[in-house]
Amino acid sequence: MLGLFTGTMIFMKNILLFVTLLLITVACNKKEDTSYNIVKYNPNDKSCQTSPDELFSSLEIIPLEGPEDVIIDTESNVIYDNNRFYIIDAIRRKRIDIFNAQGQYISSIKAFGRSGNEYIGIDHVQLLDSLVAVYSCHNKALYYFDINGTFVKKEPIQYAPLDLLKVRDGYWGYVGNAGEIPARIVKMDMKGKIIEKYLPVSKIIPLTEESSVFIPYKGDLLIRETLRSDIFKIDSTGNVHTFISFDFGRYNVPRSYFENNDPVAAATKLMQSDIAIMDRFFVNDDYMVLSVDFQMADDSDAAFSSLGICHRDKWKWLRSEHRGALSMFYSTTKALTQKSALIILSEAQPILDFKKVYPELVPEFNHNTDNSFIVLCHLKE
C-alpha cells in the first residue's frame, strides 16, 4: 500500500539532493513556558499501546466511485466539508477530485498547466465562500474554482511562501525552506506583503513539509512542523505560545540538527538517526489527534507509525506497521471531522486484513474493485 509515509521516506532518502536548492533558516528558540502539557510516548513500551476496539466504536467504509481517469492515490490529502470529500493529489496528478458523502464522483479540478488560468503546483487548498482556492507557490497566486471545476478568478500575492492560509485580514505564510528571511512564519496583508514575522531562526538546515503546517483552532492558529516536537500557537493578539509538546525519548530529533552550521552534515546526521516525524495534527472540541511516523536509520522496513488520540486529557496510542492487521493505520490518517471521525484513505487489502482480526468494527463491503476507499473511524466517547 502506498501511504503518505512513503512520500516522507522518499524525501528523507533524497534530502541531500535538496540541500543546494532548498535551504531553510531554522533554530530552536522557544521561550521557557511551563503552562503547556508535555506528552511522553515510548512506542516500544507495550503498556503504552491501545487496541483499536478501545479507540473506535465503528468503521464506515466508503468506496470512491468515479470515471476511469479518476485514479485515487492513497498518498493524497483529504478535506471533508459540507458532505463532500475533496481528494487532493498534489504530488503526482496535481488535481482535486470531489466526491459526495456516499463516495459518488461529483467533479474534478484539473487545471495543471502554464496558461493564465492554470497552476503549476498545488501547495495548499482551502474552501472559501463555496469556492475551492488552490494556492500555487510557483505562480505566487490563489486560483479559485467552483464545485464543478470551473475557473472563477485568480488572486496574485506579493510574497509567496511555501504554505499559505488565507484569513479575514490577510494571509499566514510558512516560509519553510525558502531561507529568504529569518523566520518560519509570516503574516501578510491583503496584498500579500509581509507585515509580521514569527518564530525567528538563525541556522540553515534543509526541511520540507508533506502537508499543511497550519491548524486554525478557536480563533488561534496552531503550527505543526515535521521535525519539531512542539505544536506552537499564535493567539489572536499575535503572541506565540507552546500549545503542546511531545517527548518521544530516543526518537526525538537531535538538538544538534537544529544547531549545525553545515546543512549537509545536519542532513547526514538526521539520516543516520532513528527519529520521530510529526506527520499530522488535528484538534476539535473533544479530541486531539497526532499522526507520527518513526524512521529507522539502519532498516527502512522496520519503520512504523503511531496514532495518538487524546480525549478528556488522556492520551491513547495505536502503533502500526506497513504489514499486518493494523497496516490500514500506517500513516494514512488524513483528517478529523467535527463529529469526531478520523478519515483514512486506503486500498481494499489493508481493510480486509483489519477486518479479519476486528470483524465487529468493520461492516461488509464490496472489495472487488480497484478503487480506493474512504474509511471513517468513529472515535469512542
What are these regions (language model features)?
Residues 60-94:
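Beta-strand-rich domains and repeat architectures in extracellular enzymes and scaffolds
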Residues 68, 110-118, 156-162, 201-206, ...:
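Short coil/turn segments at the loop-to-beta-strand junctions that recur within blades
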Residues 31-65:
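Blade/loop signatures of beta-propeller domains
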Residues 73-77, 119-124, 159-167, 206-213, ...:
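Repeated scaffold domains used in trafficking and secretory/extracellular systems
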Residues 26-27:
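C-terminal motif of bacterial Sec signal peptides marking the signal peptidase cleavage site
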Residues 65-70, 104-130, 136:
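Blade-loop segments of beta-propeller domains
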Residues 244-264, 309-339:
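Conserved blade-ending motifs and adjacent loop-strand segments that build the rim/top face
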Residues 121, 136-183, 197-206:
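Asp-box/WD-like beta-propeller blade repeats and closely related beta-sheet repeat scaffolds
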